[in-house]
């Protein structure tokens, strides 16, 4: 599991794209020239940006070669760069930085977010959506299984929190719109939940394990999911998935 799997990621493309659509709807910009899609993945969010601003120069950034290859194939009119978000520098100041479900993987948001704001033009916008599920059973159980099986903690850190992000971005010279939404995804089985998180949150826990260790981990994880996520009357499972949204407009 050394690289991301675009096919597995896109298995839930509609569910993953919905937050990007809702984030984009709150971006208060019309005619813009320069856009960056940070953590663009296979290009599903980039496609939304290109649809809204077809004349803009849109650059997708991702550290995964597989994701970049998929995005280039899907969107030949956009530019894609394989790079670390923290180190990438645009050729010119940006009108919009869009980051859908990517910045949660990076540390030290107290430095990262002001840095991203510094890359914007005056009145430019930083639009961010991050999964806020560190305390959800899906992610708590990852840590519990790892502890049971004596594996090191590979999970990401929790988000800084609504009040912290508001202060960080206000102090960086932005007007801030921030909100939190919990989606309830209908899942056909507990295995479907595993398929979902295997493409994202579960990757760090599995990537250094042998095949047999991965199987032991997933078997125990499946057992725990069954205990935490009961079936509905129609035998579907409701997967709660909170997400944090931020639209920050530079005023300085």
From Swiss-Prot:
Q: Where in the cell is it found?
A: Cytoplasm
Keywords, A to Z, come to: Cytoplasm, Methyltransferase, S-adenosyl-L-methionine, Transferase
Any one Gene Ontology MF annotation carried by this entry is: trans-aconitate 2-methyltransferase activity
Matching InterPro entries:
Methyltransf_25, SAM-dependent_MTases_sf, Trans-aconitate_MeTrfase, Trans_acon_MeTrfase_C
EC number(s)?
2.1.1.144
Q: Does the keyword ATP-binding apply?
A: no
| Catalysed reaction equations from the record | trans-aconitate + S-adenosyl-L-methionine = (E)-3-(methoxycarbonyl)pent-2-enedioate + S-adenosyl-L-homocysteine
Q: Which GO terms describe its cellular component?
A: cytoplasm
UniProt keyword Ribonucleoprotein present: no
Q: What is the main EC category here?
A: transferase
Q: Name one GO biological process term.
A: methylation
Similarity comment text for this entry = Belongs to the methyltransferase superfamily. Tam family.
Task: Tell me the function of this protein.
Answer: Catalyzes the S-adenosylmethionine monomethyl esterification of trans-aconitate.
The record's section on HAMAP family has: Tran_acon_Me_trans (MF_00560)
Name of the protein in its database record: Trans-aconitate 2-methyltransferase
Q: Which organism is it from?
A: Escherichia coli (strain SE11)
Q: What lineage, starting at the top, does this entry show? A: Bacteria, Pseudomonadati, Pseudomonadota, Gammaproteobacteria, Enterobacterales
Name of the encoding gene = tam
């Amino acid at each position: 599991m050394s690289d991301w799997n675009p096919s597995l990621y896109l298995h839930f493309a509609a569910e993953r794209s919905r937050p990007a659509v809702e984030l984009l709807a709150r971006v208060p910009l019309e005619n813009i020239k320069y856009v960056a899609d940070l953590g663009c993945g296979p290009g599903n969010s980039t496609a939304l940006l290109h649809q809204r601003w077809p004349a803009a120069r849109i650059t997708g950034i991702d550290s995964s070669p597989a994701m970049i290859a998929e995005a280039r194939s899907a969107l030949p009119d956009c530019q894609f760069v394989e790079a670390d978000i923290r180190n990438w520098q645009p050729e010119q100041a940006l009108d919009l930085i869009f980051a859908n479900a990517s910045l949660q993987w990076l540390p030290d948001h107290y430095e990262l977010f002001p840095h991203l704001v510094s890359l914007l033009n005056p009145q430019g916008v930083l639009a961010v959506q991050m999964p806020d599920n560190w305390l959800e059973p899906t992610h708590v159980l990852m840590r519990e299984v790892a502890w049971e099986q004596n594996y090191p903690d590979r999970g990401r850190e929790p988000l800084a929190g609504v009040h912290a992000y508001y202060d960080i971005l206000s102090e960086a010279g932005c007007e801030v719109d921030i909100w939190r939404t919990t989606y309830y995804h209908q899942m056909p089985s507990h295995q479907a939940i595993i398929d979902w998180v295997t493409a994202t949150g579960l990757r760090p826990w599995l990537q250094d394990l042998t095949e047999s260790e991965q199987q032991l981990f997933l078997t125990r994880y499946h057992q725990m999911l069954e205990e935490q996520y009961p079936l509905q009357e129609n035998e579907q499972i409701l997967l709660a998935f909170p997400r944090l949204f931020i639209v920050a407009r530079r005023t300085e």
